[in-house]
Every structure is written in C-alpha cells, then in structure tokens.
C-alpha cells in the first residue's frame, strides 16, 4: 500500500497547530540507518488510509521527494473527540531485520461448524489480533483461521493453528498458548427467550387475527337461558 508524504521544515507545538489548520498532519519517520525525518501528510488522504486494515498491519511504501521508502505505521495520535489525526509515526523497514507486529485474525466457517450448526453453541472470538515476528517479506496483512471443525465444549489455541511460512508467535504476559476461540453452550432459558423473541418478531396478519378473535368470542359465548 502506498502513500505520499512531504518534508516538514518546522517543528514544535505552534508549528504543528498551524499545519493542522491547513489540512495537513505532522509526522515523523525514524529507525534504520538514517536520521529521523520530519514529515507531513494530507489529512484527507490519511483519514481514508487509516480506515483500511492493510495500513495498520503491512509494510507500506512512502513516496517523498521522488523517492520511495518502506515503512511501518508505529503510532497514531487521534483527537479526543474530533475526526482528526493529530500526529503519526512511521518506522523504516530493513529487509534483513525481523519485525514484531500485531496482525488481525480473520475467522471464517463457524456457521458451518458442528458447534453452531448441530449443537447450537455460541462461538466467542477471544482474540482478534496476534503478536507475531517475521521478516518484512513474510509479514501477512492478516491470518485466516477456519473454524469449521469446532465442536461443543472445545476451544482453539495458538498452537492449534498453522501460521504462515516464516511467521512466529510472540508470547505476551507469560501466555505461550493463549485461547483464540472458545465455545459455550446456550442455556435452555436463553433458547426459550430467543424463541419467544423470534415469535414476537413475526408480523401478524390482520385478517387472521380478526378471524381468530371472532372464533374465540363465539366459543366463549353462553347459550340463551331456557324459559
């Protein structure tokens, strides 16, 4: 994924504030063998870019001054209540140095699994991203995990999945095999509530309702007393 950046001449709080007024976002590029570079980006283009998953979890190509440089998004500072990026940080990428990144997990197939289709269980996505280590060329935009084999009472751990070639899981907080997905049974009470809610959501035919009411009234009417 590519984006365009421009060299930034001034730094400081005042200069950054004036830059934002003109529709630009201040940033910095650091790492590698070069010195840190002050940059600025068009805020409108940046705002659309940050909505894409690939912008957060893949090696990016930054075009600046007629040259292209490979970088990673490392930090994004947002305004507390405005839709505005206040500052952005990028790190240069060395093709020979391993990266440590968080990549999204894409789950699929759970609707066809025995746990859901046969046993009517709930599937809980415990983790939605995973910390990994790899060379830049091996960095995946996401990791696809098929849940078609899930069964009642089971769970899926990191060691149960096959990571892409060249990718290693990075343990955090002493958890070397965290749970990715868990399966829980739905209680009978919850099933009854769901069925009642579904029945209540079915639209009522006015003619059928009127006919049913008339039939009920007729059945409940008392016969006239004999003289």
UniProtKB/Swiss-Prot annotation:
Q: Name one GO biological process term.
A: translation
InterPro entries cross-referenced by the UniProt entry: Rbsml_bL25/Gln-tRNA_synth_N (IPR020056), Ribosomal_bL25/Gln-tRNA_synth (IPR011035), Ribosomal_bL25_b-dom (IPR020057), Ribosomal_bL25_C (IPR037121), Ribosomal_bL25_long (IPR001021), Ribosomal_bL25_short (IPR020055), Ribosomal_L25_dom (IPR029751), Ribosomal_uL5_bac-type (IPR020930)
Per its UniProt record, what Gene3D superfamilies does this chain match?
Ribosomal protein L25, beta domain, Ribosomal Protein L25, Chain P
According to the UniProt record, one GO cellular component term is: cytosolic large ribosomal subunit
Name the gene for this chain: rplY
- Going by the entry's taxonomy, the superkingdom of the source organism is recorded as Bacteria
Q: Family per UniProt?
A: Belongs to the bacterial ribosomal protein bL25 family. CTC subfamily.
HAMAP family in UniProt: Ribosomal_bL25 (MF_01336), Ribosomal_bL25_CTC (MF_01334)
In its UniProt entry, what is this protein called? Large ribosomal subunit protein bL25
Q: GO: which molecular function terms?
A: 5S rRNA binding; structural constituent of ribosome
Cite the source lineage. Answer: Bacteria, Pseudomonadati, Pseudomonadota, Betaproteobacteria, Burkholderiales
- Alphabetical keyword list: Ribonucleoprotein, Ribosomal protein, RNA-binding, rRNA-binding
* Quaternary structure and partners: Part of the 50S ribosomal subunit; part of the 5S rRNA/L5/L18/L25 subcomplex. Contacts the 5S rRNA. Binds to the 5S rRNA independently of L5 and L18.
What does the UniProt record say this protein does? This is one of the proteins that binds to the 5S RNA in the ribosome where it forms part of the central protuberance.
Q: Looking at the keywords, is Ribonucleoprotein present?
A: yes
Which is an annotated Pfam family here? Ribosomal_L25p
């Amino acid at each position: 994924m590519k984006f365009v950046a421009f060299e930034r001449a001034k730094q400081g709080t005042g200069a950054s504030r004036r830059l934002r007024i003109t529709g630009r976002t201040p940033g910095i590029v650091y790492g590698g063998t070069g010195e840190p570079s002050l940059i600025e980006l068009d805020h409108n283009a940046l705002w659309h870019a940050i909505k894409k998953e690939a912008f957060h979890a893949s090696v990016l190509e930054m075009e600046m001054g007629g040259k292209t440089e490979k970088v990673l998004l490392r930090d994004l500072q947002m305004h507390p209540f405005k839709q505005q990026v206040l500052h952005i940080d990028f790190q240069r990428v060395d093709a020979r140095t391993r990266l440590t990144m968080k990549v999204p997990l894409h789950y699929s197939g759970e609707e066809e699994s025995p746990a859901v289709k046969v046993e009517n269980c709930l599937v809980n996505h415990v983790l939605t991203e995973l910390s990994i280590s790899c060379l830049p060329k091996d960095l995946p935009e996401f990791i696809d995990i098929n849940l078609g084999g899930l069964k009642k009472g089971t769970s899926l751990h990191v060691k149960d999945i096959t990571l892409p070639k060249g990718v290693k899981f990075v343990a955090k907080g002493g958890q070397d095999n965290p749970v990715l997905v868990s399966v829980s049974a739905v209680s009978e009470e919850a099933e009854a509530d769901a069925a009642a809610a579904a029945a209540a959501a079915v639209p009522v035919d006015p003619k059928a309702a009127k006919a049913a009411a008339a039939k009920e009234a007729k059945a409940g009417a008392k016969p006239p007393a004999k003289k």
